[in-house]
């Protein structure tokens, strides 16, 4: 018997060893490894008496100089964040974050090295919308902050505290949301800057509750002294404007403490910004600057700090609301000419896409766009992803290796984050395109509505696998390069001379790739030739705007001085017979 057992063991031992090794290699790792540590997060009744829906976020940081909620980024200096959805969370009930909860950049609290950390929690509150398309969705309505989860009014958060974290130890770390973000006061009007807001009939009908859009308006010198004047309107598109920034009516603060700009590598860049803001005020009010009205549109919404200024299945008819409700209101209130030949668009990055996108979608309503470093305008180069041909957004196709696609670089090509990093950060901040961040808003604007009422994903947010059926919808509706090529026979005559695009050839987000592709088409056009401009900045990063004479850190502060004189030149060339070219051309 003993001999038989010995023979069996001799035969079975190699097989058992193989099975043992396979079991070990198949054990869950990193984000899936077991840990009994938990974080229990709650809020007291004195802070909020009602049950709340939203996204519960836990931030863990090694840096005690700032609150952890302000330390989450795509770059290598980011701290840790974990998130879960909560529905109907009542006062004193605990939301639990354990090792099964997905995090960024570490995938689980089980991966956190033992040590002392600063911890903070925050509840990003959702509102329930009963939309006109029949869907009921829960989203974070903007509350005047421009979709900033870490400072949105009404959000609950905890006082940061230092705790010892050891995932190998059983226990629960309790966190109380003892504070609430205060309301944001309305901006102050001045002689030159005015703020307007209207309730949009179109958006109110779509969202099933009152929805507003607004504008920060910069009035020309002499506006009150020349009541007979009627002005061209310039729309400076871009991210959410609290007020009309870049315009300073007083000299730079002599007591301003200089700060360092890591983006530009400049000490005292805040002082430079104030100097150029004041310089614009001096130019604007001087005798020779063209007299026009400039607006920055306020169209923050439940998905992002702006809407991309076009109609969308998920966001609603923001394009029509801005073009046919807000702009006529502004033009009437501030004595603008009120015709397409006297309206112009410019902006950078998001504003660059909006400038070109609005010009393409509403070709007769505007007389020219100046699009700097636009977000992807050809989805064959959705940054560096070809959504029509690539299988995965995060990794290059390979049988034997995983090469990640980069997401952010500097002008030397040094990588600070990957596309997977960026998207996983957003996934922690919010599921179903609710992060309020860049990739999610592109998806919200461009995608059809999914069966659950939320944007249908262009790719799996966790794995990067692309859904090519969604990509086809994007192509037909929002790929600006494709739309121009498809419809040039009808669009071409309306857009001749109106398209101007600028981009650095080392744009941090690879936005120049799409510009190369659209340029190939534009330069091939005839009947008519597009007769515009596409230009590149050598070694220029995001967001180069066509200025070859000054560094990017300076030229980005001079959009108005760069483009408004060119707008006036185009008005002089293209205004229809009998157009008013004189009432607004006064000196003082």
Regions found by a protein language model. Give the residues of each.
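N-terminal processing/targeting junctions
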Residues: 20, 38, 224-226
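Contiguous beta-strand segments within globular domains
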Residues: 34-43, 49-57, 212-216, 235
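N-terminal secretory signal peptides that target proteins for export/translocation
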Residues: 1-7
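Bacterial Sec-dependent signal peptides at the C-terminal "C-region" and cleavage site
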Residues: 8-36
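Sec-dependent signal peptide recognition
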Residues: 7-18, 137-147
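Non-catalytic cap/lid and distal C-terminal segments of serine-dependent acyl enzymes
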Residues: 62-102, 107-588
């Amino acid at each position: 018997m003993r001999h038989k057992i010995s023979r069996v063991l001799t035969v079975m031992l190699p097989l058992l060893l193989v099975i043992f090794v396979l079991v070990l290699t198949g054990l869950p790792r990193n984000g899936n490894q077991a840990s009994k540590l938990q974080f229990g997060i709650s809020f007291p009744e004195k802070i909020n008496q009602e049950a709340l829906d939203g996204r519960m976020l836990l931030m863990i940081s090694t840096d005690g100089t700032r609150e952890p909620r302000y330390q989450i980024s795509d770059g290598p200096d980011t701290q840790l964040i974990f998130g879960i959805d909560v529905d109907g969370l009542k006062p004193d009930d605990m939301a639990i974050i354990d090792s099964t909860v997905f995090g960024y950049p570490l995938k689980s609290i089980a991966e956190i090295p033992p040590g002392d950390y600063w911890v903070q929690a925050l509840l990003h509150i959702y509102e329930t919308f009963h939309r006109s398309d029949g869907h009921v969705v829960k989203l974070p309505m903007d509350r005047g902050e421009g979709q900033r989860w870490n400072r949105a009014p009404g959000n609950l958060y905890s006082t940061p505290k230092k705790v010892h974290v050891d995932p190998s130890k059983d226990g629960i770390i309790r966190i109380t949301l003892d504070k609430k973000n205060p309301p944001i006061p309305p901006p102050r009007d001045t002689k030159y800057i005015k703020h307007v807001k209207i309730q949009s009939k179109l958006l109110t009908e779509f969202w099933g509750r009152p929805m507003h859009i607004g504008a920060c308006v910069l009035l020309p010198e002499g506006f009150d002294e020349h009541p007979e004047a009627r002005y061209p309107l310039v729309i400076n598109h871009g991210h959410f404007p609290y007020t009309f920034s870049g315009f300073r009516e007083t000299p730079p603060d002599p007591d301003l403490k200089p700060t360092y700009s890591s983006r530009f590598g400049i000490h005292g860049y805040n002082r430079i910004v104030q100097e150029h803001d004041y310089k614009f005020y001096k130019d604007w009010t001087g005798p020779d600057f063209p007299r026009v009205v400039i607006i920055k549109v306020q169209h923050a919404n439940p998905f992002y700090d702006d809407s991309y200024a076009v109609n969308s299945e998920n966001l609603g008819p923001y394009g029509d609301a801005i073009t046919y409700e807000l702009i006529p209101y502004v033009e009437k209130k501030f004595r603008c000419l009120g015709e397409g030949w006297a309206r112009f668009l410019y902006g950078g990055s998001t504003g660059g896409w909006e400038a070109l996108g609005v010009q393409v979608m509403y070709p007769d309503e505007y007389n020219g766009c100046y699009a700097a470093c636009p977000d992807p305008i050809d989805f064959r180069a959705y940054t560096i992803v070809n959504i029509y041909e690539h299988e995965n957004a995060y990794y290059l196709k390979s049988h034997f290796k995983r090469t990640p696609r980069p997401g952010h670089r500097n002008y030397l090509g040094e990588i600070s984050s990957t596309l997977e990093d960026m998207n996983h950060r957003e996934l922690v901040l919010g599921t179903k395109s609710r992060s309020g961040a860049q990739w999610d808003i592109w998806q919200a604007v461009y995608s059809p509505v999914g069966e659950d009422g939320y944007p249908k994903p262009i790719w799996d947010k966790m794995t990067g696998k692309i859904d090519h059926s969604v990509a086809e919808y994007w192509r037909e509706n929002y790929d600006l390069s494709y739309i121009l090529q498809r419809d040039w026979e009808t669009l071409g005559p309306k857009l001749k001379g109106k398209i101007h695009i600028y981009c650095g050839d080392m744009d941090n987000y690879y936005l120049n790739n799409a510009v190369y592709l659209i340029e190939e088409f534009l330069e091939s056009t005839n009947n008519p030739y597009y007769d515009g401009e596409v230009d590149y900045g050598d070694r220029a990063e995001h967001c180069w705007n066509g200025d070859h004479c000054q560094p990017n850190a300076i030229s980005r502060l001079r959009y108005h001085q760069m483009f408004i004189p060119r707008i006036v030149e185009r008005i002089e060339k293209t205004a229809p017979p009998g157009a008013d070219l004189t009432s607004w051309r006064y000196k003082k």
